[in-house]
Amino acid sequence: MLALADRAQMPSLAMRLGSLLVHSGSDLFDSTAYPAPPLTAKDGGVLDRELILALIRQESAFNPKAKSHAGARGLMQLMPRTAGFVAKDRRLGGAQRNQLFDPELNLKLGQKYIDILLGDVRIKGDLFRLLTAWNGGPGNLNKWSRKVKHNDDPLLFIESIPSRETRIFVERVLTNYWIYRIRFNQPLASMDAVARGKWPHYTSERELAVEVAEDGRN
């Protein structure tokens, strides 16, 4: 049943079944506990695979019909008001909010929101602040950054966030992210940075592609 769910690209079911194998040592555990279904955005745009998979795993457990008590919808659990802002379409915050259950639209807007947050002067491409803003909101990130005394220590910053929900969210999504990076044989520069007491800067797959292309020309 577990292998069938994995092969049939049923990530939500595979993840639930895979959680039963935590102590079994099964070779299937990585692919079921950390599913990696194909991701396609509405406009066919490039998605930052490992980061989006990490967010989806925590937000919706790969259930495209997930809806939170606060009203967040879809794979990436986008709030209708946020989706309307990102899409510049107020209808998504109102009568058309259920369109957010469309996986391709949800992924498209989720990726755009990631890009918006990464470009925010308060975040500056930092993974800790990005995930804090994603879960707690940019306004709370700004407030907590002013009030929390962390002496520029990234781990102290996370542990000092007043919201327990946001602290746990950041820790779990980062864990997911690094596991997906390992699974896909990707560098772990952000994890190494945290180990050295540095802020983990996020480099998107698009930025990596540019760097590789530039290295090839040199």
How would you label these PLM feature ranges?
Residues M1-N218:
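Catalytic glycan-binding domains that act on GlcNAc-containing polysaccharides
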